[in-house]
A protein has these predicted regions:
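Generic structural signal for hydrophobic core residues of well-folded globular domains
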Residues: 99, 103, 121-125, 175-179, ...
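Active-site recognition of the HExxH zinc-binding catalytic motif
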Residues: 89-102, 115-119, 172, 180
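Juxtacatalytic substrate-recognition/specificity segment
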Residues: 1-110, 125, 139-142, 162, ...
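Short, solvent-exposed loop/turn and secondary-structure capping segments
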Residues: 50-53, 130-133, 187
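Secondary-structure boundary/capping residues
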Residues: 35-36, 127-130, 184
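Active-site-proximal alpha-helical
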Residues: 26, 141-200
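Post-HExxH zinc-binding segment in Zn-dependent metallohydrolases
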Residues: 108-151, 201
């Protein structure tokens, strides 16, 4: 179900097509289930910010409320440069959060892995390029593991927020390389029943 202003009808149709195709492509790992997924294409920046109060204005282009099966996204017209390609990426990213909540226990899954899986599946690789992560290391900006989850819960300064995402994706891709495709998904789906440290062992 895609809610939208009349002027955003073409974006709503595009969103439905992107989400339908993506959901089918990941259904063997993360089935959507019987509950509907609701999408709100925000008609204005102010309307979007009402839903994104915990973020700085312009800090994110989409957000998910997995327990409600809801995602709220900015259409390309509310993105810098028109961002049509980014629109599809945002839709896929937010859908992954909803699918993870339906297939694992959110409370057992670290926030960094939740974000990392969302970026991995939506192919947001640029944020954690080897050069970007190396720069973080050289500048002493690597976030200690014990603090990483909190960086997603209390988004503040823009650079630290972006660093948290880059680090999450880098760690997730490392896990994927080490464990392989099947091992990685066995780990993720084990989080239905056990906390991450136990699943990792």
């Amino acid at each position: 179900v895609v809610a939208h202003a009349p002027e955003d009808e073409s974006h709503a149709r595009a969103a439905l097509a992107v989400l339908t195709e993506f959901a089918q492509s990941v259904a063997h790992r993360l089935p959507v289930g019987d509950a509907p997924v609701r999408v709100l294409v925000a008609p204005t920046a102010a309307e979007f910010q009402k839903h994104a109060r915990s973020f700085l204005p312009g800090q994110v282009s989409g957000l998910a409320r997995p327990s409600e099966g809801l995602m709220v996204v900015r259409p390309p017209t509310l993105r810098a440069g028109g961002g049509a390609g980014d629109f599809g990426t945002t839709l896929r990213h937010e859908l992954v959060h909803i699918l993870l909540a339906r297939n694992v226990d959110d409370a057992l899954m670290p926030n960094w892995l939740n974000e990392g899986v969302a970026m991995h599946l939506s192919r947001e690789y640029q944020i954690a390029s080897p050069v970007a992560v190396a720069q973080m290391f050289l500048e002493g900006r690597i976030i200690p593991y014990r603090d990483l989850d909190m960086a997603f819960m209390t988004p503040g300064e823009e650079r630290e927020f972006n660093d948290a995402y880059a680090q999450a994706l880098s760690m997730t891709r490392h896990l994927h390389r080490r464990l392989g495709e099947e091992g990685f998904w066995a780990l993720v789906l084990a989080l239905r029943d056990m906390p991450f440290p136990d699943a990792l062992h």
